[in-house]
Amino acid sequence: METKTAKLLDGKAIAAKIQQELSVAITQLQPEIGRPPGLAVLMVGDNPASAAYVRNKEKACAKVGIASFGKHFPAETTFRELEKVIAALNDDERVDGILVQLPLPDHLDAVALLHQIDPDKDADGLHPVNLGRLVRGEIGLRSCTPDGVMRLLQEYEIPLQGKQAVVVGRSILVGKPMALMLLEADATVTIAHSRSHDLKSITQNADILIAAAGRPGLITADMVKPGAVVVDVGMNRVTDASGKSRLIGDVDFESTAGVAGFITPVPGGVGPMTVAILLQNTFTSYSRAAKK
């Protein structure tokens, strides 16, 4: 019997398309506004993975014509100091988007810090005002990763209306906003998590399965409905027997690709889409300046 292989949902290609569209839109709007869009990225401490993500975001900004204002602070920086920096960025007319790179050192309250960002400059879409707008179905800046997933599904013309969608993970970064966006698209949504009983029986019902639990290889082929759309949000750095570090998702890709209809790779699936939506959110805030 011939084994079918799932079609890849190529986040890298779709992200490149979004970046190209943004580049054109920025070129057209910049003469009217008189400056490029601006994104401020705040990083605290020396987490190597965070530093790599920040470099990646700055590179993406340069590619589309967004000015990036990178601000790197020592690990011992206080909440009060960061609060002052964010207040200044809120008032800075050159800055359209503000992003605090997570995770933060233990002594800093990430949620309280995110509250300090002007909701209209909340490039990550994590401010309570923007999450509230999402709950109400209102226009606002949306959480980058789940919005990136939605755009990916849209680009591949994957129908969501009336479909059974299962989100594994309930974080405020991905799981909860992801469920709300799927609900908004008329899917029937189930959220599963670490306390769910018999995860396998839940995921086997999914037409659309979103894995966002942060547990490497959690989803295996026997947990997937044949022909399902499997989106792997997990980004887990693991060390193999030779001591080399590599990135793997929450889905066991090799086995699941033989069952699913569509699947995202890790890396190259959801990651590039997250960055593309970050740029999109910054541009959305920037374009408001043209209307003022």
Curated annotation (Swiss-Prot):
Gene Ontology MF terms in the entry: methenyltetrahydrofolate cyclohydrolase activity; methylenetetrahydrofolate dehydrogenase (NADP+) activity
One Pfam family matching this protein: THF_DHG_CYH
Pathway: One-carbon metabolism; tetrahydrofolate interconversion
Keyword Oxidoreductase: yes
Chain sites annotated for binding NADP(+): 169-171, 194
Example of a GO cellular component annotation carried by this entry: cytosol
InterPro entries: Aminoacid_DH-like_N_sf, NAD(P)-bd_dom_sf, THF_DH/CycHdrlase, THF_DH/CycHdrlase_cat_dom, THF_DH/CycHdrlase_CS, THF_DH/CycHdrlase_NAD-bd_dom
Residue ranges of coiled coil: none
EC annotation from Swiss-Prot or TrEMBL: 1.5.1.5, 3.5.4.9
Any Gene Ontology biological process: methionine biosynthetic process
Catalytic reaction list: (6R)-5,10-methylene-5,6,7,8-tetrahydrofolate + NADP(+) = (6R)-5,10-methenyltetrahydrofolate + NADPH; (6R)-5,10-methenyltetrahydrofolate + H2O = (6R)-10-formyltetrahydrofolate + H(+)
UniProt keyword terms in alphabetical order: Amino-acid biosynthesis, Histidine biosynthesis, Hydrolase, Methionine biosynthesis, Multifunctional enzyme, NADP, One-carbon metabolism, Oxidoreductase, Purine biosynthesis
Role, per record: Catalyzes the oxidation of 5,10-methylenetetrahydrofolate to 5,10-methenyltetrahydrofolate and then the hydrolysis of 5,10-methenyltetrahydrofolate to 10-formyltetrahydrofolate.
UniProt similarity note: Belongs to the tetrahydrofolate dehydrogenase/cyclohydrolase family.
Subunit record text: Homodimer.
Name of protein: Bifunctional protein FolD
Source organism (scientific name): Nostoc punctiforme (strain ATCC 29133 / PCC 73102)
Species lineage: Bacteria, Bacillati, Cyanobacteriota, Cyanophyceae, Nostocales
